[in-house]
C-alpha cells in the first residue's frame, strides 16, 4: 500500500502530529500509533502514515482527511489529542500539531501526486513565519522546488504544504534511497542557491530525514497483543494492587 498526496487538492486536509518519545523501546510507541491510525478511520481519516526520524528523536503521525470547517478541525484536534493522551501519554510527548494543505509539487513520472510507502525515505524542511509573510514564503519555497527538482539526483517527488491555522510551511521530498539523500546534503551548496529566495524572511529552517515505518493498509499484526511498555506499566499496577491487598 502507498499514501498518495495530490499536489493541489482543495478538498483534502493534512494533519501532522509530532512526538518526542520518552521510552527506550521506540517500536512500542510505533505499535500504539498503528492502532491509533486504525481508530482514526472511524473519524473519517482516509489515509495515515508514521514517519520515524533516522538521526533525531522524533516521530510524526500523518493523517489525510476530507476538507472540514475550522470549527470541525478544532473539534477533531481535541478528540485526537484526547485519544493520544489515553493511549501514549506514558510513551511520548506531543510537541507540535497542525493542519496543512498541499499547494504544489513536482514528480519524476509527471504525475500530480506524491506517493510513499513503508520503507521509503523522506526529507522534511519546515519553517514558521508571520501570517503576513506566509503566502510569500510558500511561493518562494515552491519556486525553489520547481527550479531545483530536476537537478537533484535520486528524488522521486517533492511536495509543498501550507499551514492552515498556523503560519508555517513544510516541504517534503521522497527519495529513491537514503544514499541519494545523503549525497545531496553533503555535495550541494544549498544555502548559496536558496538565499536569494529566502533572505527577506526572518525564519529558521528546520530539516530532518525520516523513514516511513507504516502506511494505512499495512497489516497490523497482533492487534490484541500487549506491548513491552504496557507489560511494564501493568506490572507496576499489579504490584501496587498487591501491596494494597497486603495492607
What are the roles of these predicted feature ranges?
Residues 1-172, 176-247:
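Short S/T/G/P-rich N-terminal loop/turn motif that feeds into the first structured element of a domain
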Amino acid at each position: 500500500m502507498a499514501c498518495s498526496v495530490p499536489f493541489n487538492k482543495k478538498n483534502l486536509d493534512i494533519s501532522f502530529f509530532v512526538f518526542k518519545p520518552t521510552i527506550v523501546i521506540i517500536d512500542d510507541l510505533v505499535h500504539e500509533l498503528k492502532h491509533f491510525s486504525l481508530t482514526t478511520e472511524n473519524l473519517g481519516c482516509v489515509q495515515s502514515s508514521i514517519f520515524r526520524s533516522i538521526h533525531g528523536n522524533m516521530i510524526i503521525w500523518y493523517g489525510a482527511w476530507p476538507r472540514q470547517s475550522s470549527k470541525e478541525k478544532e473539534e477533531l484536534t481535541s478528540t485526537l489529542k484526547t485519544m493520544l493522551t489515553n493511549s501514549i501519554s506514558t510513551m511520548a510527548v506531543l510537541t507540535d500539531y497542525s493542519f496543512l494543505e498541499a499547494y504544489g509539487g513536482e514528480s519524476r513520472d509527471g504525475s500530480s501526486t506524491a506517493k510513499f510507502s513503508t520503507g521509503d525515505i523522506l526529507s522534511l524542511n519546515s519553517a514558521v513565519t508571520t501570517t503576513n509573510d506566509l503566502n510569500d514564503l510558500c511561493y518562494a519555497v515552491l519556486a525553489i522546488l520547481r527550479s531545483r527538482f530536476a537537478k537533484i539526483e535520486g528524488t522521486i517527488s517533492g511536495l509543498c504544504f501550507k499551514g492552515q491555522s498556523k503560519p508555517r510551511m513544510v516541504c517534503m521530498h521522497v527519495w529513491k534511497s537514503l544514499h541519494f539523500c545523503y549525497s545531496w546534503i553533503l555535495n550541494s551548496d544549498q544555502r548559496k542557491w536558496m538565499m536569494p529566495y529566502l533572505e527577506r524572511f526572518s525564519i529558521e529552517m528546520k530539516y530532518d530525514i525520516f523513514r516511513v515505518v507504516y502506511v494505512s493498509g499495512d497489516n497490523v499484526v497482533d492487534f490484541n497483543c500487549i506491548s513491552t511498555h504496557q507489560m511494564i506499566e501493568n506490572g507496576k499496577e499489579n504490584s501496587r494492587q498487591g501491596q494494597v491487598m497486603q495492607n
